[in-house]
Amino acid sequence: RDPWRAPGARAPIPLARRALDGDRFRRATRECLMGVAAVDALLRESGIDRDIIRGRSTALLYVTAAAYGSSNQAFVVAEALRQARTTGAVSGGTYFPYTAPSTMAGEVAIEFELTGPYGILIGGATATIDALWQATRLIADGRCERALVLAVETFEECADLYSRGRWLVKRPLVEAAACVLLVPGARRV
């Protein structure tokens, strides 16, 4: 299947890698960079100012099936190389804290100054549906005024692991990031 045709009549929005200020993103994983880019693309394409989502009135729900497999793989490989060398240190590109799924929510929250409720759901498409439902509940219960639901999947760094279990995973493995903003109102939530 052609992943560019998957959305039907809607064209995918390419995630341009924007210049991120400062040293904070120097060691950020691709998952984090894709997550920040997806939220940025949502705001840009919708004409929404960052100030609208800033603060405690915006919830963030992060969803993934791959759940940081890529960053964990990069960390394990770098650590194995470091331990295999007896002289000098091998510096891996991934810090241990970046191997946790909570890193995505944290980096996005820091970048967009989100301090509202957040959650992490691991499990793919069904988890995404659950995240959308949870977002509507957070809004309906008055725990937030709006909710971002962010899904990010990366596979490149651990493609060999997926190829070994190829009977379990249908092709193609498509790396993607998507974000929606839910707000209250008729046909909006």
Which residue ranges define each predicted feature?
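Conserved "HGTGT" condensation-loop signature of ketosynthase/thiolase-family condensing enzymes
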Residues: 1-117, 121, 129-130, 137-144, ...
